[in-house]
């Protein structure tokens, strides 16, 4: 690969990691669908209100089970949602009110575009007070928006806003409705600012035209509400990409000196039908409804509602859908995920292109649940690992770059929770991250040459002799770099050690699940550590637990690696090329919470089962000789970097990559 091509590849890393996620939408609309409430799943977004009516209505709100069993709610054959009232039972004016339903959204919502498609709304019936509205958690300070509301023989929708203090609107805004009050604040009492729509936008005339659509655009500067008859619904709405700039003149354009961003906070949506109460009962006599007690319009309303159940058969909502749109949120998650995949894929391609770097086929370990072999001995004895077959053929070093994840790769299952019950095998994970590759030049050990592969991994030249298994403890391998736990080497195919590296940010105390293994003996050697064990192709012995840093460091004379369980992994066919060992996660590429890009292939994640404690002291590293005389070197760990951008590859890291690769190419 030419130097210029490599530079372009490195440049693509920076671009893919630094570009801010954008809206992945090619349409002209700036609104993206976030939620759709309809059909069988309509009620998934609502909870039932069954308390006393806050507006003092003559009503009994049903809970969900009663509403379903009594037929007050149902999903129709056409897929619409029906929500009605009891229209069969004659009541006593002095008893409980008429059964009805009030549902409230489970969540609160912010500024956006909200569209409701109604096949039917409660008709123009005396005593009714239907409403579709929203309200903040702290009324009136967080505001209230009445999108659809009417009482008694209503035929024109009334849009009302309520908030605290003084909130004045302009009546000069272009709108089809008529503003009768411009003060939304509580200084005007409970009236609020009111815009009344044209006749036919509510009640019986609305239903006679096969219903229609209401749309509300709520921003920090204004609230606009449109009404569209069934035959006049904009094409952008029917196509699912609403464009408010093409909606035309709204029924209500609510804007003025009022700060909407401050006065109207997160809102929940409410759909209900009540009877009489403060408004419908208060104006009952002025609406052309029968008055039984001229001195008490509210009591006249209650009398009518109690004694005339059949009048309320048309007092129902039939909703085709409610859709929620917000600016640029519909695809943002997918965009971020796509960006992460792009960044990691480019990193893999760059590392694959490094010349003169060889890798040995590495088997992938699928865990947890391998067999645990331990000595059947009293509690004073320690777990003994079952040695693998020491006869291993030496394979020549292949000049094959570590491949990107392929369908052949078997993903390791997710590690169990730390809350697993006692007796379960806990699997800890360590992820090796893309690091600054300033250690590309070869390093020498006592018996053999170690070539730096990257990320702290090493490779011994094929001249190294086959390492035989050793079940006896070996002396620990201290380190001269930043605290890194030395792990026992394992050999695969050609006797090449498979090093295990650990990030400095390994959790301080990660307790493994107990599988009944005996505890270590007090007579155990002072610094126990299993030596390297060679294995047959297809069997990968698990690594010894990775020590985690401690504040005090390792006491002098103490072993940096505690006695661990031995875990035997079932045979698995070896991949034809170098296969990555991945951490237990849904995919082979991960973006960690510490803003590092995890790299697959030979930069491997390893799993282990043991208590983990790592020395925080700085000690010198020396190669460990095996029984056969081959040396297993511990390569200095490459520094892990955190870039300035929260999820980007650092510029300093890129400079290190370029310098390191240039040195390797010149060599």
Curated annotation (Swiss-Prot):
A lipid is attached at residue 644 (GPI-anchor amidated glycine). Residues 645-667 form a propeptide. Glycans are attached at residue 63. One of its GO terms (molecular function) is endo-1,3(4)-beta-glucanase activity. Residues 354-427, 448-646 are annotated as: Disordered. Its EC number is 3.2.1.6. Residues 25-288 form the GH16 domain. Transmembrane segments: none annotated. One of its GO terms (biological process) is cellulose catabolic process. Keywords: Carbohydrate metabolism, Cell membrane, Cellulose degradation, Glycoprotein, Glycosidase, GPI-anchor, Hydrolase, Lipoprotein, Membrane, Polysaccharide degradation, Signal. Residues 354-363, 379-394, 623-637 have a biased composition (Polar residues). InterPro entries: ConA-like_dom_sf (IPR013320), GH16 (IPR000757), Glycosyl_Hydrlase_16 (IPR050546). Coiled coil: none annotated. It is found in: Cell membrane. It is a lipid-anchor; GPI-anchor. PANTHER family: ENDO-1,3(4)-BETA-GLUCANASE XGEA (PTHR10963:SF58), GLYCOSYL HYDROLASE-RELATED (PTHR10963). Mixed-linked glucanase involved in the degradation of complex natural cellulosic substrates. Belongs to the glycosyl hydrolase 16 family. This is Probable endo-1,3(4)-beta-glucanase AFLA_105200. The lineage of its organism: Eukaryota, Fungi, Dikarya, Ascomycota, Pezizomycotina.
